[in-house]
Curated annotation (Swiss-Prot):
Pfam families, per database record: EMC6
InterPro entries named in the record: Emc6, EMC6-like
Taxonomic lineage from the root: Eukaryota, Metazoa, Chordata, Craniata, Vertebrata
UniProt modified residues of type N-acetylalanine: 2
UniProt source species: Homo sapiens (Human)
Major place of residence: endoplasmic reticulum
Residues exposed to the Lumenal side: 45-50, 107-110
Protein's UniProt name: ER membrane protein complex subunit 6
Family the UniProt entry places it in: Belongs to the EMC6 family.
Key word Hydrolase present: no
Subunit text: Component of the ER membrane protein complex (EMC).
Length: 110
């Protein structure tokens, strides 16, 4: 008779260290893109609402690229898709505004 192997019911095993590492990579990507897009917005001279729309477009583009990179097996790397869209969004906004105002002042004011 063949041995019966019982399948484990419940959620798959997830390494907490790997989850933290992936979150750190997402945070690094979001911070880098925020700094780069803020510098770009400052050099282009975007002001007011146009500057914030530029940040929104850069964030959406980054999220789409992250989803494309994760592929169909995103659940192998993340618990949910939400961190790909919203992870580090507010912290990235602060970085964006910092670089945006600094480079706008350097290029267009001085």
């Amino acid at each position: 008779m063949a041995a019966v192997v019982a399948k484990r019911e419940g959620p798959p095993f997830i390494s907490e260290a790997a989850v933290r590492g992936n979150a750190a990579v997402l945070d690094y990507c979001r911070t880098s893109v925020s700094a780069l897009s803020g510098a770009t917005a400052g050099i282009l001279g975007l002001t007011g609402l146009y500057g914030f729309i530029f940040y929104l477009l850069a964030s959406v583009l980054l999220s789409l690229l992250l989803i494309l990179k994760a592929g169909r097996r995103w659940n192998k790397y993340f618990k949910s898709r939400r961190p790909l869209f919203t992870g580090g969004l507010i912290g990235g906004l602060f970085t964006y505004v910092l670089f945006w105002t600094f480079l706008y002042g350097m290029v267009h004011v001085y």
